[in-house]
């Protein structure tokens, strides 16, 4: 049995607490959050332990697996601690907000042979797996990705790395996955589309991103935090005489639901695959996607 701890206890983060209890070879033994009320309530809810001292949990040799589901600004801190103690790590995207420190972090992870997974769970969504299978013998020419939500909280967006690192990350990864390729040209338009509130915080509320991939597939992304319908997530794949629309693979009742409902199955499947592996999962993909995010942001600042 792999004894585990979840770091960060927001509503969405608690999905991991439930999933650790569902997987046959894992158990939830500790939860941790800097917020005393959150950690005490979660410990009571999930019938596990907690502590006001994170180092105390780290020093417990029985706790092998740590899930980092805390705010993005804290990922680097917890990663460094967990690498030091040679723990197994499941980290929500992104790895770090500091591009200059990404290489050194990854170098430490690999040199110490840390088993780690970056939570690119959208790849494990039933709908997207079905779409991926449908294009196995087809040539995709254009991919259109839309992600629009009603979350206009500037503080939360900045804390999570901004529009592209927070909202775009999963979709940049999915585009590479569907295209079986990497982008070679990126053009981002965000300044003229975004609200003043976001711009004055060096962030964007809306953006259009166009990419040309190395295999000549064109990908168009539309991102927005101002959608009154709720969470709108659509992926369309176009080729000669075919179009595959993600809406056809979701129940109508959940099309505009939040991602934790629409892709609930994917969280469990990604974590489950990782714990049964004897090696890291999606680390290189996470590194690559983080660098794509940086390029998208660079393009936004000059256009």
Question: How would you label these PLM feature ranges?
Answer:
Residues 16, 46-108:
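Beta-loop-alpha module in the N-terminal Rossmann-like domain of NAD(P)-dependent dehydrogenases
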Residues 73, 96-154:
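A contiguous active-site-proximal alpha/beta segment in oxidoreductase catalytic domains
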Residues 52, 91, 116-118, 246:
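Hydrophobic residues in well-ordered beta-strands that form the structural core
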Residues 29, 62-64, 141:
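Conserved acidic residues
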Residues 7, 65-70, 214, 272-303:
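C-terminal helix-rich "cap/oligomerization" subdomain common to oxidoreductases
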Residues 199-204, 215-272, 282:
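NAD(P)-dinucleotide binding in Rossmann-like oxidoreductases
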Residues 154-218, 224-229, 284:
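Rossmann-like dinucleotide-binding domain that binds NAD(P)(H)
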Residues 1-45:
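N-terminal Rossmann-like dinucleotide-binding module
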């Amino acid at each position: 049995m792999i004894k585990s701890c979840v770091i960060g206890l927001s509503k969405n983060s608690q999905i991991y607490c439930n999933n650790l209890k569902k997987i046959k070879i894992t158990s939830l033994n500790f939860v941790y959050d800097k917020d005393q009320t959150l950690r005490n309530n979660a410990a009571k809810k999930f019938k596990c332990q907690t502590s006001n001292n994170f180092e105390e949990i780290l020093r417990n040799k029985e706790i092998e697996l740590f899930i980092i589901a805390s705010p993005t600004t804290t990922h680097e801190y917890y990663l460094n601690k967990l690498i030091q103690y040679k723990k197994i790590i499941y980290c929500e995207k992104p790895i770090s907000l500091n591009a200059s420190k990404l290489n050194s972090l990854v170098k430490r992870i690999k040199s110490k042979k840390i088993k780690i997974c970056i939570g690119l769970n959208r790849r494990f969504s039933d709908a997207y797996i079905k779409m991926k299978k449908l294009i196995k013998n087809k040539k995709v020419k254009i991919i259109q990705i839309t992600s629009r939500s009603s979350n206009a909280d500037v503080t939360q967006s900045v804390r999570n790395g901004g529009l592209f690192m927070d909202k775009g990350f999963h979709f940049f990864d999915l585009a590479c996955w569907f295209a079986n390729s990497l982008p070679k040209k990126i053009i981002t338009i965000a300044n003229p589309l975004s609200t003043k509130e976001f711009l004055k915080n060096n962030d964007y509320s809306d953006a259009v991103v166009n990419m040309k991939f190395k295999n000549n597939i064109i990908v168009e992304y539309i991102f927005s935090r101002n959608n009154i319908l709720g969470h709108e997530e659509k992926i369309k794949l176009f080729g000669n005489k075919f179009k595959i629309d993600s809406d056809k693979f979701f129940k109508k009742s959940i099309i505009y639901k939040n991602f934790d409902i629409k892709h609930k199955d994917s969280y469990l499947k990604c974590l489950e695959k990782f714990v049964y592996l004897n090696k890291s999962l999606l680390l290189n993909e996470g590194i690559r996607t983080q660098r794509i995010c940086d390029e998208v942001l660079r393009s936004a600042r000059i256009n």
